[in-house]
Amino acid sequence: MTQVLERQRWLSGLPPADPGPWWKRLLRSPILWITLVLIPFYVFNLIHQYQMLSPDKTFPDGSVAWGLNDDALRMAAFWAVWTALVYSALFIWLDRFRPQKPLVWLLAFGWGACASTWISIHINSWAGEMMQTTSADAAAGVRPAIFIAPFVEEASKATILFLLLIFYRNRYIARFSVVALGGLSAVGFAFVENIIYYGRAIVFTSKTIEAGDPEAAVREIVLLRGVYTSFAHPMFTMMTSLGLAVALGARSKWVRVTAPLAGFILAVGGHMLFNGMASLNSQENLRTHWYMALGLVGFLTASLILSIIGHTRIIRQRLIDFRRGGWLEDRDVVVFSSPFRRIKLHLAGICRGPKTWWRTAKFMRLITELAHTREQINRGTVGPGADHRTHELVHQIEELRPDALTEPLGLTIIPRRQRPRPFPQPTHPVPPRP
């Protein structure tokens, strides 16, 4: 019976009932094997890209494309890292309800920065040769940038999402996690791509007198790619991620197939339109299109905010189900369905030491997983074994409750210092008068 139950849990993407010792949990963890495969692959990608981009390239017409030197790469990385930090923080913040491990965030970012750029460089270069790009003129690569690069780049950036879904299944990947991980992959891709563009601009302006002021030229491209159009890659990859997120919560097999495909088609179409307008129009004529793109970014942001609000309502309803059954306390429904109360508990736990913070974070993760598992049972998107998993989560929550922060009412983020009370003066009895 135990083997049948474990088999059902594995097929449903649920963790095993008896995880065993730490070494067995480590060997069973998909993230271990994914990391052991991807990290060497990332290192190879970066080294190979460096070897490809460093030497000068001479074209058949005699023109030369200067290679990237170490000084240019260091300066370009300095300018590119700030945009990557801002967008990475935003997507990590989005992954708040069932947050992934930091290693998963790093792998998603590394896939976009290393693997996706390596794949795109090879396929886009091959496509450019097939389309007879025979000069160093940037206008010669317009057709590959419009008709080839969007398909290649969007597919390569989203590949990490499919890999994680295949290995993790329903165990850890939630709908907002898919969007966050896809965004991190896009941020990594844009980070390395910006390094290449900034580095080429630095090398070109330093070796070409006609380019004018090198610093002004570099600042111009940094503002263009790092500020004004920095939303492009994350926005397109979010479309594919949203399609996958819809597929995760759907019971229909038809929706599970068509939703990711529709998201990918929208991402490719938007990418093609963006590259086409950027390649065929001057910067003065792109102001109206830029405002339209900002409107689309605002629409996607508003959609995510509404989705977060709807997600909190779902968590609240599922926690109410457990409260009616007597498995949770009344305040659990109010506290853990509010993002702001959860943030306060996190901050208060951090200020009270690593042990308190760890127990509080684990408590919130367990109670959120309990609500998600209940929602999957109601929607029919999880197989047998989920009921047994809910009982395990309830027992783990009750065991952890005495050591975790569970009530923000009256709780100060920074604990008050206990002032030592003055030691009372000793009082000696007065001897009676004779």
Model-identified regions with their sequence ranges:
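Hydrophobic alpha-helical segments at protein termini of multi-pass membrane proteins
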Residues: 1-434
